[in-house]
Amino acid sequence: MLHSQIKSDIKQCYENLGNQLDNFIPRRAQNYLVAEIAKTLAGEYHQKHRMLVGEAGTGIGKSLAYLLGGIPFALFNNKKLLISTATVALQEQLINKDLPLFNRIYPKEFSFILAKGRQRYCCNHKLEACCATNNDQQVTLWEEKPKKSDLDLLRRMLKATRDGKWDGDRDSWPTTIPDRVWPQIMADKHSCHAGLPQHRSCPFAKAREHLDKADVIIANHALLMADIELGGGVILPEPEQTIYVIDEAHHLPKVARDFSSAASSLKGAATWLEKLNQTIGKLAELAEYKKAARFQDAILENIQHLIPTLRQVANNVDVGMFSKDGIYRFEHGELPAWLEQEAKGCKDASKKALQSLGKIHDLISERLKDNEIQQRLGEQALAESGVYLQRLENLEKVWALMAQPKKDKGAPLARWIEKNPDNEGDYIIQVSPLEVGYRLDQLLWSRAAGAILVSATLRALNQFTYFCRQVGIYEMDSTRFLALASPFDYQNNARLVIPALSLEPQADKFTDLLIKTLPEYLEGETASLVLFSSYWQMNKVADELRPLAKKNKWELLVQGEESRHITLKKHKDNCKSGKPSILFGTGSFSEGLDLPGDLLKNLIITKIPFGVPTSPVEEAHAEYIESCGGNPFMQISVPEASKKLIQSVGRLIRKEDDMGRVVLLDRRIINRRYGKALLDSLPPFKRVIEYS
């Protein structure tokens, strides 16, 4: 049961909220979501499995709901609350708006912090080494001789660090730090960690101390996945001590799959292995040769197996088997016998080399800690060995996945070879799981103190089934499911118009039909957004309509012609000055674009956003479903299109008093068997269907 003190704290928050915000009106759906989150975390639905999956439509106020339902419970039970998001925009909203507001209304003290990965911080010792007056020392840390402007920038950064005016966070430096500069000073787990006394004052170590003390932590999905891939509790708090709120949860499956994937070049890897071959003697000397000799021998032996093998694999690749995109995918993830054999050898050799280099790295670290070697030499050696450790870790992951035997149950791995665009004659080996749900369940859901997954779009075709399968949540395992409709009056404030068209989007002449049809639905409109399925089609239509736009004094703004920020600013300025403004955009404009009020009155969607399985992972997934007797179009394409279409129409109504219309120029929503399910999953617009 939910403790009376937690109930009291939540009630007090609501009372204080009324005092803090003018015209605050409690929303029934938000109140219900708060109560369900609190009851789920308290174990009222299941004592051990404390999970809620909630789709909360636009306007409900889900972020305030999970703060109200989650923070009082977490603090009362001495747990951390970790909020994971997919976008920087939501992180900024939470840090700069929602959490400061909650801090004012919550009757008790609590602290919150934005967590970032180690690579967002500089290492003080690397920064000092780069600024050293010894030119030889400077240059050895750079792949190319540094520019004077780069060294001047580094010296300013060092001074700001020493003066306490910069915390070492890349994002907080007032100007953009060039990508050629940042890797020289970036913290890494091998050479910059709190185990070395001289690094305990480095920016990441300090940030980690603050994170350990914080009650509420904001992170992104990538950092969350990085932590659980390491076993949990390494970068972020232990899962058993953490209540997770996964906002924008519909992005989690892709992020999780990307983190479980791996890629490595063949000849490129052989090249850096040769460099390791040349430098390992120097590292072994610093590690104390007597102790390091056997590890050095093991590294040399395994490198000398890897280098010719990787080159031989590259030479054995048949260039005639690649698609026009430079990709060859192994059907059903099955490798030819010769490559399967080489994969096993590469897996074993890279694993042994990694273990042995790790031992040498640890020996150098110990000697540095005991002041047995010069700090400058030790730091430089750790940085160098750290780079090779990271490369070997990746190499071992790639070949371990390539060598993994076929499972009796479940989806196979997607495996493919890609031409290296940066190095002619070289190839990149790539491996990715098709399904990551089991891994998420094993590493996160089964260990978490509680988990709340929310988004405005989680269901496909009005069901949670597709999302649950993606993230490893089983609908019969006592998880609490909620689908809360938006409070907006769609029926009276918005129309969904489906014009009678003669062609479907896949027809050859459909682009010509768009050019002919669009002006009818742009005429007389002040603020329009037209969403296309491809850049090619968008640009073709834009080019054909420019003369008409000029004649009618429409301002036509096309995605990609200028930065997103400038394009949207021009659109907003046009709307404010009363000039008809038309935005042309592709898929990225269908999510996360906020154009409330007079900034959008007319949304035109040129086609149902079906994705064609073109990537190796998508092709492999479709192939697997077919092999199981399923239908990839109905099991993947239609659910994905449903989610994307909901996101697209969601651009129109952003606030309670917004009004406008959606025009869908795709007749398939009327005349195909899946059309009704897609249509019924949309918000309850007033429908104007021009088909008899």
UniProtKB/Swiss-Prot annotation:
* Residues in Helicase C-terminal domain copies: 514-692
SUPFAM superfamilies in UniProt: P-loop containing nucleoside triphosphate hydrolases (SSF52540)
| Keyword Oxidoreductase listed | no
Q: Please tell me where [4Fe-4S] cluster binds in this chain.
A: 123, 192, 202
What's the catalysed reaction?
Couples ATP hydrolysis with the unwinding of duplex DNA at the replication fork by translocating in the 5'-3' direction. This creates two antiparallel DNA single strands (ssDNA). The leading ssDNA polymer is the template for DNA polymerase III holoenzyme which synthesizes a continuous strand; ATP + H2O = ADP + phosphate + H(+)
Q: Which InterPro entries is this protein grouped with?
A: ATP-dep_Helicase_C, DinG/Rad3-like, DinG_proteobact, Helic_SF1/SF2_ATP-bd_DinG/Rad3, P-loop_NTPase, RAD3-like_helicase_DEAD
Which cofactors does it use?
[4Fe-4S] cluster
Molecular function terms from GO? 4 iron, 4 sulfur cluster binding; 5'-3' DNA helicase activity; ATP binding; ATP hydrolysis activity; DNA binding; DNA/RNA helicase activity; metal ion binding
**In its UniProt record, which GO terms are filed under biological process?**
DNA repair; SOS response
Annotated keywords: 4Fe-4S, ATP-binding, DNA-binding, Helicase, Hydrolase, Iron, Iron-sulfur, Isomerase, Metal-binding, Nucleotide-binding
Q: Where do the annotations place ATP binding? A: 56-63
Question: Helicase ATP-binding domain spans which residues?
Answer: 16-293
Q: Name one Pfam family in it.
A: DEAD_2
| Keyword 4Fe-4S included in the entry's annotation | yes
Could you tell me the superkingdom of the organism this chain comes from? Bacteria
Family of this protein: Belongs to the helicase family. DinG subfamily. Type 1 sub-subfamily.
Give the protein's recorded name: ATP-dependent DNA helicase DinG
Q: Which organism is it from?
A: Photobacterium profundum (strain SS9)
Q: What is the lineage of its organism?
A: Bacteria, Pseudomonadati, Pseudomonadota, Gammaproteobacteria, Vibrionales
Name the gene for this chain. dinG
